Amino acid sequence: MAEGSRSPLRSFVEVAPGSHFPIQNLPFGVFRRRGSPEPEPPRPAVAIGDFALDLAAVSDAGLFHGPLLSASPCFRQETLNMFLGMGRPAWKEARATLQKILSADEPVLRDNEALKKKCLVPMSDTEMLLPITVGDYTDFFCSVHHARNCGFIFRGPQTPVNPNWFQLPVGYHGRASSVIVSGTDIIRPKGQGHPTGDSRPYFGPSKKLDFELEMAAIVGPGNELGKPIDINDAEEHIFGLMIMNDWSARDIQAWETIPLGPFLGKSFSTTVSPWIVTMDALKPFTCEAPKQEPEPLPYLAEKNHVNYDIPLEVWIKPKEQSEPSMVAKSNFKHLYWTLTQQLAHHTVNGCNLRPGDMFATGTLSGPETESLGCLLELTWNGQKEISVGNSTRKFLEDGDEVILTACCKGEGYNVGFGTCTGKVLPALP
C-alpha cells in the first residue's frame, strides 16, 4: 500500500506514540556501538523507535534483494556518501526494503532472535556520529522575515531588504571542517569586535554568542562541473534534511562582514542533528510555498513550488537550571526560496555539487515574535531581554545548552528529526 499521511504501516519494533522515529520515517545516520570489547568502525543505520537498525548487519544477512543494493558495499562504509551518490532509485529501493523487513507482518527479522539482536541496537548503546563527509557547505539566507529583521537592526527601516534578495537565493560559502554532530560542546570563540569611540577594535571572547535555527539539505548524486541542474530536476539531487544550528558570534560578524560577508563570526562551529530525514518521508507534509513577487527568472521558475510543514522549536537550558525552557517556535514552511530553487541557483553557473555536500536554509524565522529563530532578532541585538526559565538572556552565556528540535505531525504518527544540541563552554585562556 502506498505511503501517505494516513499510512497504516506498523512495525514489529515497539514504537512509543510520541516517537520521532516510527516506520513511516526511517531516517539515516551513522553510529558506533558503545562498550564493545574491540573498537568497532562506524556503521550506517536507520532509526526505528528507540533502536538503530544496523544496515551493515542487514546487508551482511542478505536482506537487500533489489538490483541496486543486493551487491553494493554502500552500507559497509563509514559514512553515507556512497549511498547518497547512488541516487533516488537506490534510496527508494532501500526505503521499501527496510519498511518491509521492519513491518509487523514480515517474519524475516521479527522471528529470528539472533539476527534481530545483531541488527537492532538500543539507542542507549550507540554513539551517534556525523553521518556524512561534508565536502562543501553553503549557507543561504532564505527567510524574508529574518532578512527584513536583520536589515532593520543593521541598516534601519529605509531599505531593510536589498533588492537582489527577491531576485535570487542569497548565499555564502561556509566552513565544512567545523560541521559537527549534535552533542559536541561549543568553545566560545575569540575575535575582533567593533571599535567604540576612538578606541581600536576589541579583541577577546565574543560577547554576543548566538544560535541560529536552520535546516540543512544533503546533496545526493550532484552534477558535473559546467553542467547546471535544471530547476525541475533539482529534487532528484536532494536526499534529505537535518536540523542545523549555525552558531554565530554577532559582534565578530558585525565588524568583519563588510565588504565580503561572514568569516570568523560563523566558521567556528556548525552543529547538525545525527539523523537525516529523507525527502520521501517528508512528502506527506508538503505545503504550498509563499508566493514570490516579482516572479522569479525562468531558471528559478518551478512547476512544483512547494515547501514542507515542519514545526521547529528552540530550547535553552541555563547551567543553573534543571530543565530547558522554550524560547522560539517556527516552521520550515516560512521559507521564501525553496530547497529546489536554492540547489538550481547554486549550480546555474556550472558549479558542481558532490554527494554529501550540504546547503542550509538560513535562519528560519516566521512572522510572529515567538517564531524568530535567533537571539539577534528575539532581543533586537541585545536591546531587550527574553525570559529563560527564571533567568533572562540577551545572548548566550557560558554553560547554556541550546536544544533545537523538529517534528512533523501525521495522522497517528510523527516524522521527527530528534534533537540538535550543543553546550557553550568558556573561551580558551
Swiss-Prot record:
Pathway: Amino-acid degradation; L-phenylalanine degradation; acetoacetate and fumarate from L-phenylalanine: step 6/6
Binding site for Ca(2+): D139, E212, E214, D246
Annotated positions binding substrate: R155, Q253, T363
Keyword line: Calcium, Hydrolase, Magnesium, Metal-binding, Phenylalanine catabolism, Tyrosine catabolism
Catalytic activity: 4-fumarylacetoacetate + H2O = acetoacetate + fumarate + H(+)
Pfam families: FAA_hydrolase, FAA_hydrolase_N
Cofactor: Ca(2+); Mg(2+)
Residues the record lists as binding Mg(2+): D246, K266, T270
GO biological process, one term: L-phenylalanine catabolic process
Statement: the UniProt record of this protein carries the keyword Disulfide bond: no
EC number(s) reported in the record: 3.7.1.2
UniProt entry tagged with the keyword Heme: no
Enzyme class of the recorded protein, top EC level: hydrolase
InterPro entries with a match to the protein in the record: Fumarylacetoacetase, Fumarylacetoacetase-like_C, Fumarylacetoacetase_C_sf, Fumarylacetoacetase_N, Fumarylacetoacetase_N_sf
Gene Ontology MF terms in the entry: fumarylacetoacetase activity; metal ion binding
Active site per the UniProt annotation: H146 (proton acceptor)
Function (record text): Converts fumarylacetoacetate to acetoacetate and fumarate. Involved in tyrosine catabolic pathway. Catalyzes the final step in the tyrosine degradation pathway.
NCBIfam families (alphabetical): fum_ac_acetase
Family: Belongs to the FAH family.
The protein's name in its UniProt record: Fumarylacetoacetase
Organism annotation: Oryza sativa subsp. japonica
